[in-house]
C-alpha cells in the first residue's frame, strides 16, 4: 500500500488505503510517529476490511489536543485547551475532503485513534459527537487535570472503544500522573 501526502487545510496529511473504503481511520500524529506509520498500516492491512488511513499532523500537542486549559504537569509548557478547534478541523475539513477525494460512502465507519495526549483527545472527541464509529486510545493521558470528573459526567457517544493503559504512570513521582493507577 503506497502512502501519499495530501494537503488538507494547512496540514500535510499522510494518506494510505483505498477509495470506496468501508473504514476511515484517523490518527492524530507527531513527527516522531510518522517513522512507524508504514508498519502500522501494514498491520492494519492484514484485516479483511477495506480502509483509508489518514495521519493528521499536530504541531503543538499540548495546545491542540487538550480539551481545556491546564497548567504544566512537567516542564514549563501548559495546555492550551484547543481540542475544540482540532475537532472542528477534523469534522469540517479532513473528513469531508477525504470523503470527496476517495469517494467514501456516506455511512463510512470513522475510527479516531491516538497515542498519549492524542489518545485523550480521541476519548474527549467521542463525548462531543456521535460521528465516530470507534475510538482507539493507546496509553491515553487520562491523568490530565479534571479528566476523571469530566468523563463521569459526559458519556462517550461511540459504539466501540479500544483502550490500552500502561502501568508506569502509577509508579511515577509526578502526583498528577500517578493518579492514573
Place the predicted regions along the sequence by residue:
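Serine-hydrolase catalytic machinery in alpha/beta-hydrolase-like enzymes
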Residues: 9-12, 19-103
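Gly/Ala-rich beta-loop-alpha elbow adjacent to hydrolase catalytic centers
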Residues: 113-118, 122
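The conserved beta1-alpha1 loop
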Residues: 26-30, 139, 165
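A conserved short beta-strand
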Residues: 131-143
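Short helix-loop-beta connector
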Residues: 105-108
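Aromatic pocket-lining residues of Rossmann-like dinucleotide-binding sites
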Residues: 125-126
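Short beta-strand immediately N-terminal to the catalytic nucleophile in serine-hydrolase-like folds
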Residues: 111-114, 138
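The feature captures the conserved acid-bearing segment of alpha/beta-hydrolase catalytic domains
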Residues: 141-181
Amino acid at each position: 500500500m503506497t502512502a501519499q501526502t495530501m494537503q488538507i487545510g494547512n496540514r500535510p496529511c499522510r494518506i494510505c488505503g483505498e477509495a470506496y473504503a468501508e473504514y476511515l481511520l484517523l490518527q492524530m500524529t507527531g513527527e516522531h510517529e510518522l517513522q512507524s506509520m508504514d508498519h502500522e498500516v501494514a498491520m492494519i492491512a492484514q484485516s479483511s476490511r477495506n480502509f483509508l488511513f489518514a495521519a493528521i499532523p499536530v504541531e503543538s500537542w499540548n495546545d491542540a489536543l487538550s480539551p481545556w486549559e491546564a497548567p504544566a504537569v512537567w516542564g514549563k509548557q501548559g495546555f492550551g485547551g484547543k481540542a475544540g478547534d482540532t475537532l472542528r478541523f477534523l469534522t469540517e475539513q479532513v473528513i469531508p475532503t477525504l470523503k470527496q477525494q476517495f469517494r467514501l460512502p456516506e455511512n463510512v465507519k470513522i475510527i479516531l485513534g491516538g497515542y498519549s495526549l492524542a489518545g485523550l483527545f480521541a476519548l474527549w472527541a467521542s463525548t462531543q459527537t456521535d460521528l465516530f464509529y470507534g475510538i482507539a486510545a493507546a496509553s491515553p493521558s487520562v491523568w490530565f487535570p479534571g479528566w476523571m470528573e469530566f468523563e463521569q459526567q459526559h458519556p462517550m457517544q461511540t459504539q466501540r472503544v479500544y483502550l490500552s493503559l500502561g502501568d508506569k504512570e502509577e509508579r511515577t513521582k509526578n502526583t498528577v500522573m500517578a493518579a492514573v493507577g
